[in-house]
């Protein structure tokens, strides 16, 4: 059964806004102390690693963005569907148009006590990996 939990959905949308603003302070404030980030390969990172994790990603993809097309919520679980993209910049490199990428994404946010306890990503990483391989060759 699908229900609308406005408060949890609003927290998830604030998290998206902080990502799009590359606001690591804002992201950190929205994470619970037991926050877990889970990437599309199932790798898990705790809240303590995520400030530097996001900073590193925003350095690697300085124009990273996510666009949410649909939100579905049930209780404190929010599912967001959309796309993400940006331009991969190799270490010491510069932004080049040929390194732009985009992919379809689904995100799952678990919201507890007004904070994001889990941010899980489901996507095909091949578009950015292709750019990374090309830059390395």
Identify the role of each PLM range.
Residues 83-113:
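Exposed beta-sheet edge and beta->alpha loop/turn motif
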Residues 117-137:
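Low-complexity, intrinsically disordered terminal/linker segments enriched in charged
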Residues 10, 63-64, 100-103:
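Short solvent-exposed loop/turn micro-motifs enriched in small/polar/acidic residues
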Residues 1-33, 135-137:
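Short, low-complexity N-terminal intrinsically disordered segments enriched in polar/charged residues
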Residues 24-75:
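A solvent-exposed, acidic/Ser-Thr-rich amphipathic alpha-helical stretch
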Residues 45, 74-76, 109-116:
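Short, solvent-exposed coil/turn segments at beta-strand boundaries
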Residues 31, 72, 84-86, 123:
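Short beta-strand segments enriched in hydrophobic/aromatic residues
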